Every structure is written in C-alpha cells, then in structure tokens.
Amino acid sequence: MFSAKARWIVAVVLRVAAAGAAAVAAVLMAMSHDEVIVYGMEVQAKFRYTPSLVFFVAANAAVSACSLVVLLVPSSTSKLAARLLLMADVVLGMVLAGALAAAGAMAELGKNGNSHAGWIAICVQVPLFCDRVRSALVAGSATIVLYYLMLMYSIYTLPMFP
C-alpha cells in the first residue's frame, strides 16, 4: 500500500510526537509546585511529595528517552529486532497508562478530597500546583494517544510471518 520510505516517515513522526508529548508531560509535572500561607503557616505543594506524581515524571521521561533512542537504530533491522521493539513499546505503553492512572487519582484527591477518609481538597489553597498537574495530565493523555497510535501502526506494518 505505502512505500517502505513512507511507512518509515509515518513511524518516525508518530514516535517523535509521542516522545515530545511525554517530555512535555514530564517537565510540566516536574515544575508543579506552589507555596501559600494558611492560618499563618507556610504550606508547600510539590510533585516530589507524592510518589504517584514522581512515577508519572519517571515514566514519561523514560518513554521520551527510549522513543528517541529507538530512532538511532537502523530501520533495516531484523524482524526479530522489530518484534522485540514492539514488545518493549507495549510494555512502555502499559507503564504510561499506569502512571497516568495513578497521577489522575491523586489529582482527583487534590481537587475534591475524600470526605469518607477525612481528606480535604488542596486545590483551593494551591491552585497553581493543581493547574500545572492538570496540564501535565493533559499532556500525558496526549502521550498515551500518540503512543498507542504508534503501536497500532507498528503492529499494522510488522510482517506477520518470518
């Protein structure tokens, strides 16, 4: 259907877009911090204080780096190498999904709290932090969409038989 060069270009564009979105998500989350005075006490909110947000940064940074490193591999690799790359991409996609889910759950707690557990919402006090986390989650969602498009395209173009 498409020439080998056209397939390669589409794969590279999808991979670079996914890597870029992952890098943006990681940087936005890493920049998430805010300080306010509440009842005379200084309160800080930083992504480092929540393990799931740290996981989100690490996962997106790893996906971004791995996606760019893969571009250095010659496109004329063996079918076995292509299949191994596909398996690695699937694993990284699952890590991305887990990181987004964990960070999203923490963002929900930050926004609405949990009345059953007695946890108060913090976004009223530290809106800048919550806005940056929300922006990082949007970028993380875009990363997953792009990454899964890349995966589907890789599966579609991978030869079925040895």
Curated annotation (Swiss-Prot):
Upper taxonomic lineage: Eukaryota, Viridiplantae, Streptophyta, Embryophyta, Tracheophyta
Extent of the signal sequence: none
Organism whose genome encodes this protein: Oryza sativa subsp. indica
TM region(s), chain numbering: 8-28, 53-73, 84-104, 136-156
Localization of this protein: Cell membrane
Record Pfam families: CASP_dom
Extracellular membrane side: 29-52, 105-135
InterPro entries: CASP/CASPL, CASP_dom, CASPL
Membrane-related topology note: Multi-pass membrane protein
Similarity section: Belongs to the Casparian strip membrane proteins (CASP) family.
Name the UniProt record assigns to this protein: CASP-like protein 1C1-1
Keywords in alphabetical order: Cell membrane, Membrane, Transmembrane, Transmembrane helix
Binding partners and assembly: Homodimer and heterodimers.
Cytoplasmic side: 1-7, 74-83, 157-162
One Gene Ontology CC term in the entry: plasma membrane
Presence of the UniProt keyword Translocase in the record: no
